[in-house]
């Protein structure tokens, strides 16, 4: 399998640009939920997808040293609300979201909050209709909504809330490789080299950005996001796994959490 023939998918958001810009072959760009489904069906060989996809279906290999993560406010994973977050009784979930929905459930449980959840396919520009109603937004939609409605809404930043209760970073997305792909290490090395090149030339990448202004991109890439997947990120993902099992968002797999962390490290290529 050549790199150009590889069936590769990537989330279609600003946060993924440093991880995919310059890939030599065709790339399927889509929302997290759609990419997870395509990868699970075997329609893709490799994809940058929600970290929750690995937690619920740990058949994949993980490209080591690369993730989309944060160790504080992430800016682009938010609950838009009016009034106090404790007063919200209904949250509309972004149908494109995977990891963020379950992160939200974990954080609400931590805060002892229990609003209803509804699914919506409405545009992000459609505002929550009343004070006790809120909406989960992710990716570029979240960025635009924050910038366009900064004076109308309050924003519960899920990265910031995670950092308040967990010392390790939160991992939103990982490169996952299907188990039948035989040259996973070669692919992983190429993706790591691409990430390194793009981050080393981040000013050039920002200068080519057409959807968001330079000042925002500089802060977003350098302050909000992290692109590593090392020991700290594995600890964060292990903590997320533990909390999802506790809330029965994931089935117990029979492994102790210490053993699971070792298995996670073993899956990296």
Q: What role is predicted for each listed range?
A:
Residues 1-269:
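Domain-level signature for soluble enzymes in the chorismate/prephenate branch of the shikimate pathway
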């Amino acid at each position: 399998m050549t790199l150009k023939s590889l069936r590769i998918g990537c989330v279609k958001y600003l946060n993924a640009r440093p991880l995919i810009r310059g890939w030599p072959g065709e790339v399927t760009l889509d929302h997290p939920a759609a990419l997870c489904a395509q990868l699970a069906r075997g329609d893709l060989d490799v994809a940058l997808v929600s970290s929750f996809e690995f937690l619920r279906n740990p058949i994949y290999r993980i490209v080591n040293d690369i993730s989309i993560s944060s160790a504080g406010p992430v800016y682009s994973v938010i609950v838009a609300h009016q009034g106090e977050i404790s007063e919200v009784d209904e949250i509309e979930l972004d149908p494109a979201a995977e990891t963020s929905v379950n992160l939200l459930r974990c954080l609400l449980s931590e805060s002892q909050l229990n609003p209803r959840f509804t699914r919506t396919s409405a545009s992000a520009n459609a505002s929550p209709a009343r004070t006790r109603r809120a909406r989960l937004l992710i990716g570029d939609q979240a960025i635009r909504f924050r910038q366009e409605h900064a004076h109308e809404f309050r924003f519960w930043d899920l990265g910031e809330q995670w950092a308040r209760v967990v010392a390790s970073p939160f991992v939103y997305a990982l490169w996952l490789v299907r188990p039948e792909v035989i040259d996973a290490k070669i692919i992983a090395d190429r993706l790591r080299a691409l990430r390194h090149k793009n981050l080393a030339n981040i000013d050039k990448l920002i200068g080519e950005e057409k959807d968001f202004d330079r000042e925002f991109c500089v802060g977003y890439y350098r302050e909000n996001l992290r692109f590593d997947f090392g020991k700290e990120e594995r600890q964060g993902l292990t903590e997320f796994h533990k909390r999802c099992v506790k809330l029965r968002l994931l089935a117990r797999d029979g492994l102790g959490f210490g053993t699971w962390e070792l298995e996670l490290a073993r899956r990296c290529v």
